[in-house]
Regions:
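Alpha-helical structural context
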Residues: 38-39, 83-84, 121, 173, ...
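Conserved phosphate-coupling serine/threonine residues in phosphotransfer and NTP-handling enzymes
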Residues: 128
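N-terminal helical cap/lid subdomain that shapes the substrate entry/recognition surface
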Residues: 7-109
């Protein structure tokens, strides 16, 4: 954990969702293995790992602005199934997978309580990549939605996190929700997330302080500046609630 001093100035917390509050890896595994069975394939862990690599590569291209979201959603399945000589339609695969994923909202233990307690002291907003309908469904069914004053999704922003345009959209939405001059109050904001490439880079691009939620103890190999780093919710509490 890194912390400069005890006099924190933050009034607003911007939270990532997947693998920060919700266990996306577990939800993804459930949805993808159901998809394999649907197309007559054995749901092996090795196939899940192969899909992970393809999916991550596609989303990284999206974050860099080199691939459109719709292309990501289809191409990841087209690439995977073509490698296994399976005549699966990309749109059918995406629709099936998306439905299963939207039905799965597995909380990281302590996430609900953390957001509840933080919401008593700070204004909380969601900043997430992904499909809007899916993210809204998962946030609602998990019980997290009630603690956030706004939910900002890349699909609706028409720009991916970490791009500056995504955060321009977020600031404008905050203004429409009644926040006065949010862009000029960036020094009061802290972005909390697990991803160096989308969350920490996003905060850097937006001029917002960042808190890298890093429970796996990964190394910062992306040359991204991080304001503070934590490995647990307990450390977030120590910084923001005490």
């Amino acid at each position: 954990m890194m912390r400069e001093d005890g006099n924190l100035r933050y009034t607003t917390l911007l939270f990532d969702v997947d693998n920060t509050l919700l266990n996306f890896d577990a939800s993804e595994e459930e949805a993808f293995k159901s998809l394999l069975i649907y197309f007559g394939m054995e749901p092996k862990d090795s196939l899940l790992q192969e899909y992970h690599q393809i999916n991550r590569s596609c989303w990284e291209l999206f974050e860099e602005g080199k691939m459109e979201k719709e292309e990501v959603l289809l191409r990841r399945f087209e690439i995977f199934f073509s490698r296994h000589n399976c005549q699966a339609d990309g749109r059918e695969a995406e629709a099936f997978y998306r439905e299963r994923l939207g039905d799965s909202a597995i909380l990281i233990p302590g996430a609900l309580e953390l957001c509840r307690d933080l919401s008593r002291k700070y204004d909380l907003y969601v900043v997430t990549n992904g499909v809007a309908d899916t993210q809204y469904r998962r946030l609602k069914s998990s019980g997290l939605e009630q603690y956030f004053k706004g939910i900002f999704v890349s699909e609706e922003a028409k720009s991916p996190k970490p791009q500056k345009e995504f955060f321009e959209y977020c600031f404008e939405q905050m203004r429409l929700l009644g926040v006065e001059h949010p862009k000029e109050r960036r020094q009061e904001m802290l972005l909390i997330g697990d991803s160096l490439t989308s969350d920490m880079r996003g905060g850097e691009n937006a001029g917002v302080d960042t808190c890298w939620y890093n429970p796996k103890g990964l190394s910062n190999d992306k040359d991204v500046s991080v304001t503070m780093e934590v490995s647990s919710y307990e450390e977030i509490r120590e910084i923001l609630l005490f």
